[in-house]
Swiss-Prot record:
Location(s), subcellular: Nucleus; Chromosome; Chromosome, Centromere
Gene: MIS18A
Identification of the protein by name: Protein Mis18-alpha
Mis18 domain residues: 79-177
Residues that, per the record, bind Zn(2+): C84, C87, C140, C143
């Protein structure tokens, strides 16, 4: 009886039963999470693109030539380093930046570091608008994370992508070179801190005790010598 009632609980209800409402809430939460993830990836791509678009291409109508050159100089001065999100090994940098692919959440680089290994097994691309492209999968040499793929063969209309490395935004992180303000202090220029001060004061106290002991020994010797001289 209970099973029959639960299977028909949604029928004839004007406000909707609890199981239906719960299912709708779960679907809504899942959709919101996916939209949030897609939005964050999109923002990351736009950030990388905006930081380095000034180094290539023409300036927009509202920008002056001076502003464009200044932005390009800043970009070249502080390039982005792309790291593996799994083990943080450097994979490449923005000096080899070509463009991004917003539809696939990928960035295209001309070259990558030795930390990127290439699987020589070739596969046909199943992506839209990439019919005829032959790809080779990219892996991190440190943690074997799947990073993306490299275009080995392309049809004539996609020749611009040939031999370019396509890194997935989900598999990489970025670091602005020179952004760290903290400097490493060498051993010969170590900062004077409370711990070193305590050690120095302890050493000085030990030296003071040694000097006092030597002073007492010297005083005893002088006393004996003066006593022996008075007897003679």
């Amino acid at each position: 009886m209970a099973g029959a009632w639960s299977s028909n609980c949604c029928r004839g209800s004007s406000t909707g039963c609890m199981c239906c409402n719960k299912g709708k809430r779960n679907d809504s939460l899942l959709l919101g999470k996916r939209l949030s993830e897609d939005s964050s990836r999109q923002q990351l791509l736009q950030k990388w693109e905006s930081m380095w678009s000034s180094t290539s291409g023409d300036a927009s109508e509202g920008d002056t030539e001076k502003e464009r050159l200044e932005e390009a100089a800043v970009a070249e001065e502080k390039p982005l380093v792309f790291l593996c999100s799994g083990c943080r090994r450097p994979l490449g940098d923005s000096l080899s930046w070509v463009t991004n692919q917003e539809d696939t959440n990928c960035i295209l680089l001309r070259s990558v570091s030795c930390n990127v290994s290439v699987d020589k097994e070739q596969k046909l691309s199943k992506r839209e608008k990439e019919n005829g492209c032959i790809l080779e999968t990219l892996y991190c040499a440190g943690c074997s994370l799947n990073l993306g793929y490299v275009y080995r063969c392309t049809p004539r209309d996609l020749d611009s992508k040939r031999d370019l490395f396509c890194l997935s935004v989900e598999a990489i992180e970025s670091y602005i070179l020179g952004s760290a303000e903290k400097q490493i202090v060498s051993e010969d220029k170590e900062l004077f801190n409370l711990e070193s001060r305590v050690e120095i004061e302890k050493s000085l106290k030990q030296m003071e005790d040694v000097l006092k002991a030597l002073h007492m020994k010297l005083w005893e010797v002088e006393s004996k010598l003066s006593f022996a001289g008075s007897k003679s």
